[in-house]
Design a protein with these regions (language model features):
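Alpha-helical scaffolding segments of alpha/beta enzyme cores, especially the outer helices
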Residues: 140, 144, 170-177
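Conserved, mostly hydrophobic/aromatic
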Residues: 115, 156, 193
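Canonical Radical SAM [4Fe-4S] cluster-binding loop centered on the CxxxCxxC motif
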Residues: 100-137
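Conserved alpha-helical substructure of the radical SAM core
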Residues: 126-155
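Single conserved hydrophobic/aromatic residue that forms the stacking wall/gate
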Residues: 197, 201-207
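Glycine-rich beta-strand-to-loop/alpha-helix junction loops that act as flexible
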Residues: 159-162, 194-196
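Flexible, acidic/Gly-rich N-terminal and inter-domain linker regions that tether
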Residues: 1-105
């Protein structure tokens, strides 16, 4: 059994839930905001300097967080497009793509491991849907790419592997997390997703 299976996935939690977690640890709630901001900057728990060792030990006894690792990275010599193959904690892999435009950097992220939609033009449907990505794994693609690039990502399109609305609850949580002002602060107007179930048109989500 994976040692994280019975622990709380902190990166999937919104700030009020993390505040409740710290309250249960007997720690002040302001620690939650410190941890939230650090996680969303891609900082490991060990590297956080404003949380004590004793508090970190209490956190790791009950919870965890981590980010996808880069298994492969390809950079286009033509337009600077970056293609990432990210490996998740369970060994599954998903793809993300960085695209550079005059208005900023856009990342295309995956929402599932595999896909059950069966679109003939898409190779990710061959083996069907393996599983949904957790909010932390959706967010983790953006954080890992931001950390690797050393630049701010200003736009997100959810048009990678998987069907976003087939993973509705986790995607909605992700949208709230990625737009939080203490996190990456990418507003809804800068996020688009594809809906292959019906029209295959992009739909933007506004506050």
């Amino acid at each position: 059994m994976n040692s994280t299976e019975q622990k709380i996935d902190l990166l999937s939690l919104e700030l009020p839930s993390i505040e409740q977690f710290f309250a249960e640890l007997g720690e002040p709630r302001y620690r939650a905001r410190q941890l939230f901001s650090a996680m969303h900057r891609g900082t490991s728990l060990e590297a956080i300097t404003n949380i004590s060792k004793a508090t970190k030990e209490k956190i790791t006894a009950r919870a965890y967080y981590g980010f996808p690792s880069i298994k492969r990275k390809l950079v286009s010599a033509i337009d600077g497009t970056v293609k990432y193959l990210f490996e998740l904690a369970d060994g599954n892999c998903v793809e993300s793509v960085i695209m550079r435009y005059e208005h900023g950097i856009t990342i295309c992220i995956s929402s599932q491991v595999g896909c059950r939609m069966g679109c003939r033009f898409c190779a990710s449907t061959i083996d069907g849907r393996v599983r949904d990505l957790a909010p932390s794994e959706l967010l983790g693609q953006v954080i890992a790419a931001t950390t690797d690039l050393g630049e701010r990502i200003s736009n997100i399109v959810m048009m990678g592997i998987g069907e976003p609305l087939d993973n509705y609850d986790n995607v909605i949580t992700f949208l709230r997390l990625v737009g939080h002002p203490d996190g990456l602060n990418i507003g809804y107007r800068h996020i688009s997703l594809s809906d292959r179930k019906s029209t295959r048109l992009n739909s933007s989500h506004h506050a």
